[in-house]
Amino acid sequence: MLEVKKLGVILEPTTLPFETAGAFNPAVFQEGKTIRLFYRALNEEHKSCIGYARLEGPLNVVERWKKPLINREFSYEQHGVEDPEITKLGNLFYFFYVAYDGKNAVTAYAISKDLKTFKKMGVITPQITYQEAVELFKSARLKDAYFNFASLYKEEIGKDLILWDKDVSLFSKKINGKFALIHRILPDIQIVFFNDFRELTTEFWCEYLKNLSKYIILENKYWFESRNIGAGCPPIETKDGWLLIFHTVEEINENRIYRASAVLLDKKNPLRVIGRLKEPLFSPTENWEIAEPVLSEGKTLPPDWTPELTVVFPTGTALFGETLYIYYGAADKRTAVASVNLNELLEELKKT
């Protein structure tokens, strides 16, 4: 049986104003024994920026900045620079993040040569409304869940809401000469191929969405994926294929449970699935993975309280020997680490 070890929390919120409410969902980059974490820092106003920490070895935090590394600057990100992912391809680091303006959640990116200075390049996901997207979905002959999510968000937030396209990560090598980018339009995981980021215009996306069914890597299909799935860690190139650690969401009435899972994709054609876990890789089981409501002074949780949100949200990995360390957001508040033997995980995936 595949063994996953939970190694505990490595980052908690602090008293610094920019991260009093959360330090979680880190992008991870490994250089030998050095691990760089670019984490989502959340303040009391529920606005996010990017914090920075450095580890020596998989668990030992040796440096943590007391100010944001990347802050909110533009109107499209005025309420949040959230949930970063990072990939090095060639001589450039590509840094992706969810840009939130208080209503719309889109994906933007920045580039860096040294991981010290970042140049923001703007929004890359479709800037079309759900209303417009639904018409394009019809051409793609998508399942009902795509239309259900569109209706839900239009009713809850407004008809002018821009299509939410999140959970973006980049393959560390080009596939057949093209960039390969994983993204998530609810409820599945999709992939897009392109030659240059400048191609990602509204016209490009409209044509892509008309054919979206051709670019779905994974559909939500198992019991622990009942609501949706989404990418987590950037794809890892292995001898057997591309390993993708992703998140799953089970919805039980008003409660949501976020878990981690894994899939192995073909090296030359990542649309081809070699193997996929039929049970979670790991689930929220610890107290620090359960999101509790904020209570006023003197108040306690009622004895019949059940959590509305329990979360493990994998966002980055590091490899030491045969041990794969998985860094994840716990309870939308803190950063924790789990580990698994990489070869054993690959063998398990090849069995499925």
Question: Which residues are covered by each model-predicted region?
Answer:
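Short, conserved clusters of charged catalytic residues that mark active-site
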Residues: G230
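Beta-rich carbohydrate-recognition and catalytic domains
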Residues: M1-A21, N25-H79, K88-R227, I236-E308, ...
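Extended, compositionally biased non-globular segments
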Residues: V312-T317
